[in-house]
Amino acid sequence: MRNKKYLLVDTDYFTKQVEAEPLANIRDVDAKRFIWKSIVTQFGVPHVLISDNGLQFDSKMFRRYSGELRIINRYSTPTYPQGNGQVEAVNKVIVSELKKRLDDAKGKWVEELPHVLWTYRTMPHRSTGETPFSMTYGAEVVIPLETGFPTSRTSSFNPKDNDEQLAKSLDLIEEKRENAMVQLTYYQQKLKQGYDANVKLRPLTPGNLVLRKVVGTTKNPTWENLGPN
């Protein structure tokens, strides 16, 4: 556990379900293994994979593997990480929550990671109004708190009724996802309106001089040792 210093993170664009694995190395073979174990064997083959332009995702071997599975590879750049904003947002949450737990855990971030992922998967997401868990599996998860302090859902458990309820939930999962898509579209429109309201128009014509900002790949200083390499 102590030699794990990298974290490979995957987020589904729609359901917001997140998978993450601590790694000692982050080579193309490690990325390939992660794609197979954490994505393909659990959720099926993705249509598009958006990643940074690290060598582990842009090697001949990884491209060949993606081609065999008919996965389209797209890449964000270090100067514009917002191109993969979904994962960037999740990374901030994971790093923030890990930092909160590190003092009590004496720096054992690998052991704390499952707790952080569990919290993220079982909390409603602002953009969809649903939890990533329910968007993925069609039903809400029973959290440990419900077993210690019985709720109506756990105290009135009946195997037959439970099977029927699960079947109904699966029948309604497409409707739930359609409603979430409407909510997501509305949320994105509101974000766009807020962003556009603060944009100052600067009309340019051919021949105008412009200042080009060269952005380095420096870490966020608040992330300390938890930042990307």
Describe the function of each predicted region.
Residues 1-176, 183-184, 189-229:
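Integrase module of LTR retroelements
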